[in-house]
């Protein structure tokens, strides 16, 4: 057991004296004590370092201190650039308004100066300095063929905080807008159907449209030897197939024309006039027609042939009229002057034979009504003249030299008389029975109203003139055949205008102008309703107005007897064709419009109104695909749209079509083909489709 010794220390004392063993033990303990202290010190330091590395106290504050300048900088960017977006939106709004205002001004005045003034005024009104606005007239970004007013606005914002990040203190904010003026300049040659053949040339033909465009929604095929002259050409579904060895789709100066892939909309798809023309056929089909004329039976009056002057005189007195007895001869009379005092005269038939002249109440009242239960007829070599009045003639009128005053004429169908040894073939037309027939010269003054139950016919070499002035009216029914109007070779038929008052022109049947060397003049009328086909082989003058033909329209070989150089001509004329029927001959088979046999047609469309620039309008129903054919030397000069959206337009055999003297030809079809020496020309610049202004970008 070890005895603990108490060692006392004094400040000035030395170590106590101990033996050697104790001294060594004391030294060893002291050594280990010092060593342990060092180890504990090092372990404590490492522990504290580890603790410090794991300690998060105060980290957010430190990181915030480091990141705060960056956060403030980005916040400044967000605020100042966000404000810049607001300014940009405001600039865009102002540029839209200014562009639209400039476009309206230019559309009205065609002045770039006034365009700029209008745009800048709108910008100033909305707080944008004029120095920050640029206004120009340029091409639309949507369609290079359309003009547009371009307005660009560039303003500058000063950045306050963003420069902390080294960003420029100036922020430029831009906006721009385009407002188009009108529609694209329409193409002169347009093929609409994507699945059809497009625009196709062959056989050395040329299509000349140097001042406008050629467009196809399918192919453009122009092999070597053919030529297309245009400002540019476009195709869509198909391809452009020009000559491989030389440029044959060229501009007017001979340089290659731009050819691009672009869809072309139907320029007349929304045309109000086209829609009304299409609807007109429904009106025609639902229209009613007057009842056939019916009158009570009266006594016949016959001059010459088997009737003696005594018998004729008695018949005249029987109807309540008188004759001039001063030159009466019971054996023979070559002249009769008859007067009637009553307001109504009832007669059976009145016929004149031999070398006799008859004047029937030529100075009578216009209010006199003449009722004929039979017919009126004078033979070759005779002359028959009536005054004014109302004429109800149940059995038709046949005139060799027959004249009427003005009035109202309701005439029924000519009927052969067995007792007169008549045959159908002997009655003027030869192949059908009409109401009114001229086999020499038949003239009815005007203005007059005509209701012809069975149509009219002018025989070979004969003349018929109906009406005078502008307030005539025509309702013409169908003969015993298909025709309502028929003309023979070398004949002249003239119908005076029905363009004022209550004048109408309605035809229930075909118009057969098949007599070569003939000329028929149609009246000017707001509307010409023809419930049938128009087939012309001679000449025709088309009075101004709309011709709604519920069938087909064809012009064949024949020559003209009109004063115009063109066989068929018309000014301020629109022809609408339903295509419900088509010709059966091989040249025009299945076509709604056909021009052939070296004949020529010149048409000028109206320049104003609902039907402005509409010349020939084909079937509009997708179920009617009859197109147009110009072939065998047929020649057309047309101003306005020649429009067959659902049918092919084909040229062949030297057929030609081009502009009339005034206006522009616009050829629009499902497809368009030229072959066999044919030619198409449109040598003028078409106007834009409309003056409508639209914001396009």
Which residues are covered by each model-predicted region?
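Short amphipathic secondary-structure patches
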Residues: 2-44, 82-93, 97-159, 237, ...
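N-terminal positive-inside, membrane-proximal cytosolic segments immediately preceding the first
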Residues: 45-57
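N-terminal signal-anchor/signal peptide hydrophobic helix marking the start
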Residues: 57-69
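Short, ordered "entry" segments at domain starts
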Residues: 158-310, 317-318, 322, 326-519, ...
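Acidic, Ser/Thr/Gly/Pro-rich low-complexity segments that form flexible
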Residues: 438, 475, 488, 516, ...
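Extended C-terminal subregions enriched in glycine
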Residues: 574-635, 643
């Amino acid at each position: 057991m070890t005895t603990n010794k108490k060692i006392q220390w004094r400040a000035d004392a030395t170590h106590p004296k101990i033996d050697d063993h104790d001294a060594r033990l004391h030294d060893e303990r002291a050594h280990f004590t010092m060593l342990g202290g060092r180890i504990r010190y090092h372990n404590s330091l490492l522990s504290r370092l580890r603790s410090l590395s794991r300690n998060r106290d105060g980290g957010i504050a430190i990181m915030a201190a480091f990141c705060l300048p960056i956060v403030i900088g980005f916040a400044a960017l967000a605020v100042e650039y966000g404000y810049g977006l607001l300014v940009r939106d405001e600039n865009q709004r102002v540029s839209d308004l200014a562009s639209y205002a400039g476009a309206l001004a230019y559309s009205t005045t065609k002045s770039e100066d006034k365009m700029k003034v209008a745009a800048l005024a709108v910008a100033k009104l909305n707080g944008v300095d004029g120095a920050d606005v640029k206004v120009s007239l340029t091409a639309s970004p949507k369609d290079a063929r359309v003009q547009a007013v371009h307005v660009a606005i560039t303003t500058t914002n000063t950045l306050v905080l963003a420069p902390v990040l080294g960003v420029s203190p100036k922020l430029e904010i831009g906006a721009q807008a385009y407002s188009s003026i009108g529609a694209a300049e329409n193409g002169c040659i347009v093929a609409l159907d994507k699945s059809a053949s497009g625009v196709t040339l062959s056989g050395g033909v040329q299509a000349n449209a140097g001042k406008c465009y050629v467009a196809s929604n399918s192919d453009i095929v122009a092999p070597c030897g053919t030529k297309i002259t245009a400002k540019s050409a476009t195709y869509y579904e198909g391809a452009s197939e020009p000559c491989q060895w030389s440029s044959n789709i060229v501009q007017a100066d001979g340089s290659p024309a731009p050819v691009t892939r672009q869809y072309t909309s139907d320029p007349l798809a929304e045309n109000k006039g086209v829609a009304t023309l299409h609807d007109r056929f429904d009106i025609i089909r639902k229209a009613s027609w007057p009842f056939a004329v019916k009158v009570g039976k009266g006594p016949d009056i016959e001059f010459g042939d088997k009737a003696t002057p005594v018998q004729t005189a008695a018949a005249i007195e029987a109807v309540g009229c008188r004759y001039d007895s001063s030159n009466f001869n019971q054996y023979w009379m070559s002249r009769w002057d008859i007067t009637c005092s009553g307001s109504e005269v009832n007669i059976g038939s009145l016929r004149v034979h031999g070398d006799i002249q008859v004047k029937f109440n030529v100075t009578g009242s216009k209010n006199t009504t003449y009722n004929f239960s039979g017919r009126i007829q004078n033979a070759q070599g005779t002359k028959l003249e009536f005054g004014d009045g109302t004429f109800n003639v149940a059995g038709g009128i046949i005139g060799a030299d027959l004249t009427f005053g003005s009035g109202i004429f309701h005439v029924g169908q000519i009927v052969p008389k067995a007792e007169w040894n008549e045959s159908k073939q002997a009655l003027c037309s030869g192949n059908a029975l009409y109401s009114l027939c001229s086999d020499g010269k038949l003239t009815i003054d005007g203005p007059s109203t005509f209701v012809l139950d069975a149509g009219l016919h002018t025989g070979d070499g004969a003349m018929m003139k109906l009406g005078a002035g502008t307030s005539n009216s025509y309702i013409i029914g169908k003969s015993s055949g298909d025709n309502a109007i028929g003309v023979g070779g070398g004949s002249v038929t003239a119908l005076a205008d029905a363009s004022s008052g209550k004048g109408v022109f309605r035809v229930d049947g075909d118009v057969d102008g098949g007599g070569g060397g003939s000329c028929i003049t149609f009246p000017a009328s707001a509307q010409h309703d023809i419930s049938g086909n128009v087939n012309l082989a001679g000449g025709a003058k088309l009075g101004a107005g709309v011709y709604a033909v519920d069938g087909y329209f064809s012009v064949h070989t024949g020559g003209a007897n009109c004063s115009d150089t063109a066989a068929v001509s018309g000014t301020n004329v629109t022809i609408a064709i339903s295509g419900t029927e088509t010709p059966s001959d091989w040249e025009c088979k299945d076509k709604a419009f056909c021009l052939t046999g070296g004949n020529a047609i010149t048409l000028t469309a109206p320049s104003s109104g609902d039907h402005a620039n509409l010349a020939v309008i084909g079937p509009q129903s997708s179920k009617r695909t009859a197109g147009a054919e110009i072939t065998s030397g047929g020649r057309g000069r047309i101003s306005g749209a020649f429009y067959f959206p659902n049918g092919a337009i084909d040229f062949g055999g030297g057929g030609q079509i081009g502009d009339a003297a005034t206006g522009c030809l616009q050829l629009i079809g499902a497809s368009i083909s030229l072959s066999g020496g044919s030619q198409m020309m449109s040598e003028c610049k078409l106007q834009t489709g409309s003056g409508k202004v639209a914001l396009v970008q």
